[in-house]
Amino acid sequence: MPSLPWIFVCPSSRGIGFHLTRHLLQTTTLPILATTRSKDLEAAKQALLSGLQHQQQHDENPLAHRLTLTHLDVTHEPSIQQASLLAKSLFPPRTHHLHLSFAIPGILTPEKSPSQIDASSSLAMFQVNVAGPLLLAKHFVEFMPRKATIPDGDSLKKSRLPEHATWMFMSARVGSVTENKLGGWYSYRASKAGVNSVAKSLDLMLGVRSGRRALAVAYHPGTVKTDFSKEFWGSAQAGRGLLEVEDAVGKMVEVVRGLDMEKERGKCLDWRGEVVPP
């Protein structure tokens, strides 16, 4: 029996994750498990569905039936484990597989010089930006397809998705050691370089476990107009590109749709689909 695909987005309550979840609801037909740190899951779900086509009462809304919200804090492993148990009950591995996983938590405290480095802020960036995605992989990578998995082609065709599954980590161009010409942002740069390393290692594991059925990549979305990057919009306009969030998530999904299994697995790609050097 073909394996039914599903999507995981963590987190989904604000910024890129929020708009990505809404975009996936409208442009795919797959069920989505999305996460929020909020304990008010109903309010979080209503916010994600607000204004979308078919917005009606939950019992009549086909988009609502495809979306499940769960509490998850990437700094608290028990909440990640609980979310994985929910995933297992919603999408039994014998009949389902995780086809798109977006592990995209992130925080940023800029440091222009070593004197501005604060131990607690630095550790928090590593905890959220690197350890968080690692723990997501620990508890959710088991749902990715194996070599013998036969994905449901009809579901993927309707959603315009490739047959291989994708695990995507959120990185940033500043995580490239090769392209570091300006310095600064010591902790954030190091954390994103760590994300790129994690993506490579996970992809090597998937290559053994899943073969051509799954790959892992890191992703640089560009400078996106969210609260996360608000104080840096000016420098982006000066030459590095500034994307509206709806445009950014559309490009993100298009990069996923166009991934080259042979040339791009384990690498970091930007919003144009170009490889960011390590």
Where are these regions (language model features)?
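C-terminal helical subdomain
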Residues: 231-278
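N-terminal Rossmann NAD(P)H-binding glycine-rich loop of SDR-like oxidoreductase domains
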Residues: 9-23
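Rossmann-fold scaffold of SDR-type NAD(P)-dependent oxidoreductases
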Residues: 10, 95-108, 129, 169, ...
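Conserved glycine-rich Rossmann-like NAD(P)H-binding loop of the short-chain dehydrogenase/reductase
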Residues: 28-44
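Rossmann-fold cofactor-recognition segment
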Residues: 51-78
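Short beta-loop-alpha junction of Rossmann-like oxidoreductase domains
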Residues: 178, 220-233
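Catalytic loop of short-chain dehydrogenase/reductase
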Residues: 106-108, 113-126, 131, 141-213
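Conserved Rossmann-fold cofactor-binding substructure of NAD(P)-dependent oxidoreductases
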Residues: 72-96
